[in-house]
Amino acid sequence: MTHGTKFAALAAAALVAGAGAASAQDCPIKVGVLHSLSGSMAISETTLKDVMLMLVDQQNAKGGVLGCQLEAVVVDPASDWPLFAEKARELLTVNEVDVIFGNWTSVSRKSVLPVIEELNGLLFYPVQYEGEESSRNVFYTGAAPNQQAIPATDYFLEELGVEKFALLGTDYVYPRTTNNILESYLISKGIAKEDIFVNYTPFGHSDWATIVADVVALGADGKQVGVISTINGDANIGFYKELAAAGVSAEDIPVVAFSVGEEELSGLDTSELVGHLAAWNYFMSADTPTNAEFITAWKAFAGENRVTNDPMEAHYIGFNMWVNAATAAGSVEVDAVRAAMYGQEFPNLTGGTAVMLPNHHLAKPVLIGEIRAGGQFDIISQTSEVEGDAWTDFLPESAVLTSDWKDLGCGMYNTETKTCVQLTSNY
């Protein structure tokens, strides 16, 4: 059944039943899960597939959505970026899913964008990213740079007195764009360009000896060095092991990571990583009743040794907002759900409330955590909710842009010329 005919059927059912419940032939409602279960990103993405299965089970136990049970349709794009696009098309045209929750890397998301925009699919993307994008067909439930990268850099500057920066990233669009933003930001804060070392490595990189030696050498003049890491996937294991082998402690050269959380640390001996940092919008150690309930449910579903992390919370928030939006709209049709998403609120797991903004980003708190023995984090800094900014203020070409799908109907709006630059996301 096409999305259009499904919408017509839903509307007819609403008229007949008077309660907005989907008619029998529209059941089950299908939820696509697009996460790598093999390849270099499986270390991070497999757990996101698992949490989606838990959330679907929980919702079905509550009666489903619009009178229908939910059915999770899981595919494995295998850390293969073109395959993400193929699997997204398969989910929408063959499986006829009503919504997709998926992706980790930005290169995989950008591979999917043309497909979901062509077919009017709906993607909930749960991971921090570089910004510089706002698609009509994506809700970005992870952090934009102003909700992670910029606050973490401020912490290095203001709290740790870092004077020289090593920006280490995996070689793809998220680290490169984020580091472009950070380099511009650091220079605006008085850091000399020659005191900023930038290095990129491939996915799955394992030989870190030379790069760690280069980072150590930055401090030969006695200035405090700090590492900002946008390294993704299993390459993180080798990086942290090499730091330990080189005898580099957090007191010597602190590292703040944007893609390392509880899941990535669960496979490491963290005793020599104590004191290094990560910036997210959630940590498992958050001491709230809601988080305790979530952790208990997760361990019961997935196993006592399993941990929670930030992108899991993003899926938790996004999924529940989608359920509430579909319920409010009386339909799972994409355009109806999208319209009902704006202003959706849902309690986050750290004690506040997530709010969906007209730019398809969330208002979320910024947390900085310090690695402790055992692979958990001490939360050492937490803000109130920060509104996600799709277009950074720290790149001149982006500072004039804004996104407002609710009132302006545009994700790339020039505030100076008062025109919509473009509607599709082939930036």
Indicate residue ranges for each PLM-predicted region.
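Extracellular/periplasmic periplasmic-binding protein-like sensory domains
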Residues: 242-316, 326-332, 386-417, 421-423
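Beta-alpha junction/loop-to-helix N-cap segments that form part of ligand/metal-binding clefts
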Residues: 43-50, 57-58, 62-132, 141, ...
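Extracytoplasmic "Venus flytrap"
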Residues: 32-51, 75-82, 104-107, 171-176, ...
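Extracellular/periplasmic Venus flytrap/periplasmic-binding protein
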Residues: 86, 130-131, 137-246, 285-293
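Gram-negative bacterial Sec-dependent N-terminal signal peptides
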Residues: 1-24
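Solvent-exposed, acidic/polar segments of extracytosolic/periplasmic ligand-binding ectodomains
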Residues: 29, 345-427
